[in-house]
Amino acid sequence: CALPIWKQLTTEYSVLTAMNGIEALAVLDNHYVNLVVSDVMMPQMDGFELCKTIKSDLSYSHIPVVLLTAKTNIQSKIEGLELGADAYIEKPFSVEYLLANISSLIHNREKLRQTFAKSPFVAANTMALTKADEEFIWKLNDIIQANLHNPEFSMEDMADALKMSRSSFYRKIKGVLDLSPNEYLRLERLKQAAQLLKEGKSRVNEICYTVGFNSPSYFSKCFLKQFGVLPKDFIG
């Protein structure tokens, strides 16, 4: 007897299970999840409704969704993709094929994140794969830009400004960018510094304080670690 699909996925991943879409949303509320694999046919809340809820709710909209279905008609496939499914796999399929899809989605997201983190002029909204995520990043960046000069500006201030709980805010930033809120704030300070250095109108020490660092030496150390070059040697 073949093992259930979720059991076969445990060879590669830590797997959490749910019997239907309602249970799945409860799991997402209580755990940090990288990806959802869902059957379309489920009681209470089916896979289409689950996918729609995930992709339209800011708490989960960054999570990739793979839908599995016995429906082979093209209309069902179109419906799944229109609801935001990242992959749509028809039964029967091999677990190897499912694993390849999961791996591809996770690794492509990881490549995007690395490019964003290491490239001074790549904006955070390139990481947004849904409308909800894009709006979230725009709002967050407006708040950060308005407070960039303030070295005391913190994760708590960001969460309060967005009217989110600390835990929801942390999980959202981590899910979209794979950074903690404080890491992201520091990265945005450094990206703004790179922009100012590119414009060439201010000295390094002035830029350091403009973007909210207290210490020029610490600023230079962070800049070097992030972008592989010292601020004084940086040419945009």
Label every PLM stretch briefly.
Residues C1-L3:
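Short, small-residue-biased leader/transition segments that mark boundaries at the very start
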Residues T17-L35:
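Acidic, metal-coordinating helix/loop segments flanking the phosphotransfer/catalytic sites
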Residues M42:
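Receiver (REC) domain active-site loop signature in two-component systems and cognate sites
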Residues S103-S119:
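The C-terminal output helix
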Residues G175-N214, G236:
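Terminal helix-turn-helix DNA-binding modules in bacterial transcription factors
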